[in-house]
């Protein structure tokens, strides 16, 4: 690992009352690689993702983006660096349509005075949304129906397409396959590989060890708010990962 | 996900589809239904009193009566689309009117200069209360119901403190003559109604066509999601409550012009009337759905009923009964429609609830 990670965390700590959610956690992801982040419930995965996507203030620790130290003050700040997150609840507005969700917070203004008055170029946004969905092979039947009336798979596709379209550096996917059927899951895993091939660093959080081994290049294990192990996905096994997550391998490790 | 089958069709017809959809968004199902209800009510009264009811003179009267509520309804629609509520509009109207009347009274003359100052003062007072509402709701995280219940009492109480509880009846003649009772030059359309219409059109465009409007819907739809994608939710909420307040200030000066008095005791049910109209017009109290157009229609139903009952000789008190029934019916229809929509979709593209169990095809 001589390359500089696109995103790196060093010694992050964060407490909620008496609970140390992050206790000196390290993490790194390179451009064009899929890193799986695994850990038992309460290991600090979600907290780590929140911290790295600008949703959480830290007690201490360093975050480095492309080698330079940054302080992620807000989700939009993280977004401006090209860090995108697909949240477990997808963070879509159910009453808005797919194109509106795609561009929410980043609308394309109409040119000239109209744009300055707050009018949006809906046509351009629809076209770009359609391109983004097609690129992912996402089944989004209507760009103008409210997202709330769509299936879980379609919502997921929209949320992922949105993140992929904007992610230039890193994309976090928090349990993207948890609520999906077999076909959609395979679609999401394919998407992850495609995004990686574009040179984006992908962080994949999952409880499904077969998926993790299937899609990840490296696996980093969190336990009790700390990274306890990093494995090459090709040279590890479900047993080894579960052992590291639960601490059963502690005695065996040097 | 069977991509190949579906995508080409929707890609090809996307622009044609969206055109009809955006039209549908403007004439959303419920506001359209309620328009039909309004037409039916209108036709019934027209049949019962063909000599009096359907004349321009009478319709003009109804339009004039609705104008002030229309101005309040704009702000209320924005607020309710965010799943908020603003109970303070009536008191805010009174307070703004009282302060404006006081200032104009102290200036002495009754010319346009005084009237202009009065307008500025009234709108500023309304804006001030609105900002207070907005900051307390967005920053202090006090629920809108409580904040605006507090400012409802606060504004009304202060209005009474300022006047000693006695209405001010001195209003510059120019205000009364031109705005209050006057017509748009060359027509028989009340000036006050033209002002309301202009505001309705402007803010209808703002709500349905601009980013400000989109963020309003986004917050009502899912505030947390909006926050996460970078919408400045706090600022947006403050702006919306400030807008509602400023429009209450506008309504305050319009009310002064129309009635020639501060009418301190006359606005105790205004907030509820406006909320009822907004909801009858198809705006969801749960946020994310609503149109200004629907609100306007929703305002006309009580007004037409009131006017019609008087003309056909029914005790006008029945109007309250009828409006109550329409309100409940409107919400009932809306709930059923939404439930049916959810079921209809669940056959093919089910909601998230069913996804876990039986998603095998």
Ranges and model annotations:
Chain A
Residues 2-254:
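Glycine-rich phosphate-binding loops of nucleotide-dependent enzymes
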């Amino acid at each position: 690992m001589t390359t500089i990670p696109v995103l790196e965390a060093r010694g992050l700590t964060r407490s909620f009352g008496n609970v140390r959610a992050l206790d000196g956690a390290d993490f790194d992801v390179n451009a064009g690689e899929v890193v799986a982040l695994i850990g038992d419930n309460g290991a600090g995965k979600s907290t780590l993702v929140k911290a790295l996507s600008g949703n959480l203030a830290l007690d201490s620790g360093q975050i480095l983006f492309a080698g330079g130290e940054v302080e992620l003050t807000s989700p939009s700040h993280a977004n401006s660096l090209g860090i995108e997150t697909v949240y477990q609840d997808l963070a879509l507005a159910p009453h808005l349509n797919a194109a509106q969700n795609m561009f929410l917070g980043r609308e394309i203004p109409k040119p000239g005075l109209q744009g300055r008055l707050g009018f949006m170029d809906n046509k351009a946004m629809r076209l770009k949304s359609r391109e983004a969905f097609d690129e992912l092979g996402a089944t989004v039947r209507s760009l103008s129906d409210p997202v709330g009336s769509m299936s879980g798979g379609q919502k997921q596709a929209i949320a992922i397409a949105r993140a992929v379209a904007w992610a230039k550096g890193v994309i976090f996917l928090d349990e993207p396959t948890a609520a999906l059927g077999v076909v959609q899951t395979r679609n999401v895993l394919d998407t992850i590989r495609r995004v990686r091939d574009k040179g984006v660093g992908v962080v994949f959080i999952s409880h499904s060890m077969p998926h993790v081994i299937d899609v990840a290049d490296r696996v980093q294990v969190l336990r009790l708010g700390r990274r306890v192990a990093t494995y090459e996905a090709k040279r590890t096994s479900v047993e080894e990962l579960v052992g590291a997550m639960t601490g059963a391998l502690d005695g065996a490790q040097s | 996900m069977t991509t190949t089958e579906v995508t080409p069709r929707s890609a090809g017809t996307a622009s044609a589809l969206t055109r009809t959809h955006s039209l549908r968004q403007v004439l959303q199902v419920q506001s359209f239904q309620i328009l039909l209800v309004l037409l039916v009510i209108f036709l019934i009264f027209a049949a019962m009193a063909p000599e009096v009811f359907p004349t321009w003179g009478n319709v003009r009267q109804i339009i004039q009566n609705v104008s002030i509520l229309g101005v309040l309804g704009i702000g209320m629609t924005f607020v309710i689309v965010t799943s908020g509520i603003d109970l303070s509009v009536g008191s805010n109207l009174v307070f703004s009117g009282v302060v404006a009347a006081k200032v104009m009274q102290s200036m002495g003359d009754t010319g346009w200069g005084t009237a202009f100052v009065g307008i500025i003062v009234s709108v500023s007072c309304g804006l001030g209360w609105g900002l207070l509402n907005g900051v307390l709701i967005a920053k202090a995280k006090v629920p809108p119901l409580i904040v605006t219940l507090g400012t409802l009492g606060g504004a009304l109480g202060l209005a009474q403190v300022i006047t000693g509880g006695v209405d001010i009846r001195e209003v510059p003649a120019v205000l009364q003559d031109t705005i209050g009772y006057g017509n748009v030059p060359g027509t028989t359309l009340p000036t006050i109604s033209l002002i309301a219409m202009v505001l309705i059109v402007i803010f209808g465009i703002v709500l349905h066509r601009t980013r400000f409007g989109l963020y309003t819907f986004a917050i009502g739809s899912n505030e947390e999601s909006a926050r996460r994608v970078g919408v400045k939710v706090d600022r947006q909420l403050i702006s919306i409550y400030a807008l509602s307040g400023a429009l209450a200030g506008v309504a305050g000066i319009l009310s002064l012009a129309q009635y020639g008095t501060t009418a301190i005791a006359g606005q105790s049910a205004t907030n509820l009337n406006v909320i009822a109209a907004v909801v009858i017009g198809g705006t969801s109290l749960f946020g994310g759905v609503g149109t200004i157009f629907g609100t306007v229609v929703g305002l006309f139903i009580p007004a037409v009923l009131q006017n019609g009952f008087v003309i056909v000789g029914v005790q006008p008190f029945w109007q309250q009964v009828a409006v109550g029934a329409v309100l409940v019916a409107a919400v009932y229809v809306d709930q059923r429609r939404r439930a049916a929509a959810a079921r209809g979709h669940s056959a093919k593209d089910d909601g998230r609830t069913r996804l876990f169990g039986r998603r095998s095809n």
